[in-house]
Amino acid sequence: MKSIQVPIILVGFMGTGKTTVGKYLSDLYNLSYVDLDNFIEVNECKSIPNIFNDIGEKGFRSLETRYLKSCLNTFDIISTGGGIIEDTNSLKLLKNQKHVVWLDCDIEIIFKRVKNDSHRPNAKSKNLNQLDALYSSRLSRYNEIAFMKVDSAQSVSEICTLIKTKLLSD
């Protein structure tokens, strides 16, 4: 049987299910997994909102790029933060990866998932229109690096089946 090539990098806007899908894929295929935001928090001993407060978004993006680089050689599956494509260095790293999977769904679904989540500094206190503007500003960059795009409004098992089928046919 053909094996799945790694790393598999999950990208997409906040609230599209990258962490959930990453964990599920990891368990399903016995592959190593890391949630990049969580990895940053553990290594920096601070929450993402506190990092944003201390060094700003630009400083956070620089940290994120550094940690992405180290995770690419260490983990089989990586779920990234939604804004990873905001940094040109991260974007370049991702462009050089073969299996970047873009999870996407309707902005109304995303809004329901992320509103009132204090752990998301770029969503906190944004209304639907403001979140949609941020979402829209990122779409072309997700598209630029994606090996495949998956509608994450489906069940996690359906999403993982689609990803597996595409990866095995590649």
Curated annotation (Swiss-Prot):
Location in the cell: Cytoplasm
GO biological process terms, semicolon-separated: amino acid biosynthetic process; aromatic amino acid family biosynthetic process; chorismate biosynthetic process
Residues annotated for Mg(2+) binding in this entry: T19
PROSITE patterns with a match to the protein in the record: SHIKIMATE_KINASE
Names of required cofactors: Mg(2+)
InterPro entries: P-loop_NTPase, Shikimate/glucono_kinase, Shikimate_kinase/TSH1, Shikimate_kinase_CS
Source domain of life: Bacteria
Functional pathway: Metabolic intermediate biosynthesis; chorismate biosynthesis; chorismate from D-erythrose 4-phosphate and phosphoenolpyruvate: step 5/7
Listed GO CC annotations: cytosol
Co-factor binding details: Binds 1 Mg(2+) ion per subunit.
Coiled-coil ranges (or none): none
Pfam families: SKI
This protein's UniProt keywords: Amino-acid biosynthesis, Aromatic amino acid biosynthesis, ATP-binding, Cytoplasm, Kinase, Magnesium, Metal-binding, Nucleotide-binding, Transferase
EC number in record: 2.7.1.71
Subunit details: Monomer.
Cited function: Catalyzes the specific phosphorylation of the 3-hydroxyl group of shikimic acid using ATP as a cosubstrate.
Protein name: Shikimate kinase
Protein's organism: Staphylococcus epidermidis (strain ATCC 35984 / DSM 28319 / BCRC 17069 / CCUG 31568 / BM 3577 / RP62A)
Highest classification ranks of the organism: Bacteria, Bacillati, Bacillota, Bacilli, Bacillales
